[in-house]
């Protein structure tokens, strides 16, 4: 049944009215703008920065978000106890003064005088509510595990349903004082506090919004350098403006940020050359054309791309078949001929330049490599698998993002596997990133080309995800010896001896790779174009990839 545009418009206005009545006040002068509208830069205090992203923001809820793009936008509009400086070290943000006990188990934090974008003060209770919500099984946060990584008292037990959220080691002594208790000292605790999962949420505002929280501009509350002026799920344009009430507003020179979702590389560069973008990511085909341009930048990230395999699927539960797949595609060709963006081949789980050990050396220094391309060896594993499984042919579907680079890499891997492992057919299913992640988390897949970025500068950020039951353990691998080793390195005997812990982490990586839990592909580099009148963008390989607080555009 069809309705006229006029009737549809009236219905939309009525629905919007009810939405604003139920949960208003995202900003004091918030605007209900369409998701494709651009924002005219009328401010005299700075300029609008226009940034290309290659996927939609999946969530603006700090306790629900899981992907790098969502984290980047969240960090622009929300701030926690700490933030990252330009050199990647943790510095106080909402925290004004931090006292740490001698045993490293108690942090007493005095908060700055700050407020939300609706004028409400940011209080210690906002952190208590947010952190309890993070670990509450009812929230079903994919990042609930990170509270345990941070060592917060009782976090793991609450996540496992053995204790209640109000038993979490965080209390509000008063509106300005927060007391945090840990189970064990965590050397990277401060840097973890800059991660979006630990951002505050105002309980009263959250309760008014209900299940609409963080889904529209009027259901998002901001306390960061910028505030949201237009957003809705699957929006292709997201607009932010400078938050005049931000505690450090004097240092914010931009009038706002406009994120534009553009997945096609040719359209991206056309927009960049036309002046519609200030920051753009290049595809591999474009690197040679623009790498001599003074606006070209090459930046290494901590992201590891790999193929996840579902161990519940017949055949993929066979170690030899997984090894055959992993060794069958040419990683050097992927990074040198397809990506061309500074990415490096991955024969590992824990990336290079992530963390240094007690000896001052990078984790990869002196550490073995695994699952390197070897097409002859791949055939040997394939023959063993066929004998063990009693089959001569296999067919699997690989889930991938709809971003152009992911499609190019996937098509190359598809051709390599089908050529080098005769009788194996690989189909490709392309989905928006959000849907692809949902399928992976639900174990509703066979193979999936995916990535993981480091949340903090320690190998555990790549190792903890493979414990039994982890929401990020795509494909449901389980190994009780591995689980015990990781638990001891986190909070047991090994956690108290840095050298033994480091060796345990190397052993853990070896266990994952020897079992071919993943098929590693590459560590991501980024080839970007940045207009010459833009400076001060902070790039981080850990946590938030790009920070724009100190960016200027002349």
Where are these regions (language model features)?
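Gly/Pro-rich hinge or "lid" segments in bacterial periplasmic/extracellular proteins
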Residues: 176, 182-252, 256, 266
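Ligand/substrate-recognition segments at binding pockets and active sites
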Residues: 233-235, 379-454, 526
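Ligand-site clamp/hinge motif
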Residues: 244-288
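Extracytoplasmic/peripheral linker and loop segments enriched in polar/acidic and small residues
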Residues: 370-372, 423-436, 464-531, 554
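Long beta-strand-rich cores associated with HINT superfamily self-processing modules
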Residues: 528-554
């Amino acid at each position: 049944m069809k309705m006229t545009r006029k009737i549809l418009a009236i219905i939309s206005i009525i629905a919007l009215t009810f939405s604003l009545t139920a949960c208003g006040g995202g900003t004091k002068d918030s605007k209900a703008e369409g998701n494709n509208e651009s924002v005219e830069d009328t401010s005299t205090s700075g300029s609008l920065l226009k940034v290309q992203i290659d996927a939609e923001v999946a969530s603006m809820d700090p306790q629900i978000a899981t992907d790098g793009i969502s984290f980047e936008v969240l960090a622009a509009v929300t701030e926690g106890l700490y933030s990252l400086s330009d050199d990647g070290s943790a510095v106080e943000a909402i925290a004004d003064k931090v006292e740490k006990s001698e045993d490293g188990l108690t942090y007493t934090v005095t908060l700055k005088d700050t407020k939300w974008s609706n004028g409400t003060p940011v209080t210690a209770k906002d952190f208590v509510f947010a952190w309890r919500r993070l670990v509450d099984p009812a929230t079903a946060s994919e990042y609930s595990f990170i509270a345990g990584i941070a060592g917060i008292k009782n976090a793991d037990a609450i996540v496992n349903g053995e204790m209640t959220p109000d038993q979490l080691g965080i209390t509000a002594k008063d509106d300005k004082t927060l007391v945090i208790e840990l189970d064990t000292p965590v050397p990277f605790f401060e840097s973890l506090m800059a991660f979006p999962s630990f951002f505050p949420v105002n309980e009263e505002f959250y309760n008014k919004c209900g299940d609409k929280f963080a889904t529209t501009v009027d259901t998002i509350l901001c306390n960061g350098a910028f505030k949201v002026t237009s957003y809705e799920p699957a929006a292709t344009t997201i607009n932010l403006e400078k938050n005049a009430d931000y505690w450090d507003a004097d240092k914010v020179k931009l009038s706002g940020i406009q994120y534009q979702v553009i997945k096609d590389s040719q359209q991206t560069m056309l927009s960049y050359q036309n002046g519609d973008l200030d920051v753009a990511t290049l595809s591999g085909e474009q690197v040679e054309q623009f790498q001599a341009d003074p606006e070209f930048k090459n930046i290494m990230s901590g992201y590891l791309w790999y193929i996840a395999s579902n161990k519940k699927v017949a055949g993929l539960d066979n170690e030899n078949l997984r090894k055959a797949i992993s060794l069958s595609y040419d990683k050097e060709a992927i990074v040198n001929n397809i990506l061309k963006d500074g990415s490096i081949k991955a024969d590992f789980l824990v990336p290079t330049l992530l963390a240094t050990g007690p000896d001052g050396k990078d984790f990869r220094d002196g550490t073995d490599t695994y699952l390197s391309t070897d097409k002859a060896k791949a055939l040997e594993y394939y023959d063993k698998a066929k004998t063990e499984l009693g089959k001569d042919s296999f067919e699997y579907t690989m889930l991938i993002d709809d971003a152009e680079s992911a499609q190019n890499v996937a098509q190359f891997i598809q051709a390599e596997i089908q050529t080098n492992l005769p009788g194996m057919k690989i189909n490709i299913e392309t989905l928006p990133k959000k849907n692809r992640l949902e399928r992976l988390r639900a174990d509703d897949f066979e193979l999936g080309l995916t990535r993981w970025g480091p949340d903090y500068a320690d190998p555990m950020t790549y190792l903890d995800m493979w414990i039994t039951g982890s929401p990020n353990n795509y494909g449901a691998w389980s190994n009780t010896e591995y689980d015990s080793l990781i638990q001891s390195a986190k909070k047991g005997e090994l956690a108290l001896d840095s050298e033994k812990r480091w060796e345990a982490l190397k052993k853990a990586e070896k266990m994952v790779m020897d079992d071919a839990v993943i098929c590693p592909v590459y560590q991501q580099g980024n080839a970007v174009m940045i207009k010459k009148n833009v400076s001060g963008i902070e790039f981080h390989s850990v946590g938030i990839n790009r920070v724009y607080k100190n960016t200027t555009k002349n």
